[in-house]
Amino acid sequence: MRSLIDRLTAAHIGRTTNFYRDGAGAALRRERLAAYLEARSEAPLLLVGEAPGYRGARVSGIPFTSERQLTGSGPAEATATIVQRVLTELGLTDQVLLWNVVPTHPGTDRSNRAPTRAEVAAGRRFADELARGRRVLAVGRIAANALGAPYIRHPSHGGVAEFREGLLRFAPGGRSVRPFSV
């Protein structure tokens, strides 16, 4: 995994921000990502989203994870909160490796934007590498179209129930428990 992180750190993906290379805290984000990838090295499922959010992985270094989830302080991120909660409820946390088809952040430090086709194409190689030996599920249409993987509805904008149902449909060993409300 170290070579993947080294290549990711060196990557220039369109007009995205490579927060593993640039800015205060880049070394900490790389360290966190390395620890996360090691901890999930045997996860049979790869859940791939579109791109890091400005309040999520851009700050924490871990896909679908906010700084608040790691440290108890800092910004929370709605999608990260929902994804982590649903994975916990379904007993899938350790079974899933989270990633984004564009692993660097499109947008500014205060906003997100959709990645361009070129950015998706350039970032996909990292998802392809992590997909080896794993079942791949795509969160959202951009990831599904890029990877040709089964689509799961993104949990934002009222999609929590459909996101949850998609995980139960495709994930091995998921269990249905009482849903939470957002």
Where on the chain are the PLM-derived regions?
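A polyanion-binding, active-site-adjacent surface
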Residues: 1-146, 150-151, 157-158
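Short, flexible loop segments at boundaries between secondary-structure elements
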Residues: 148-179
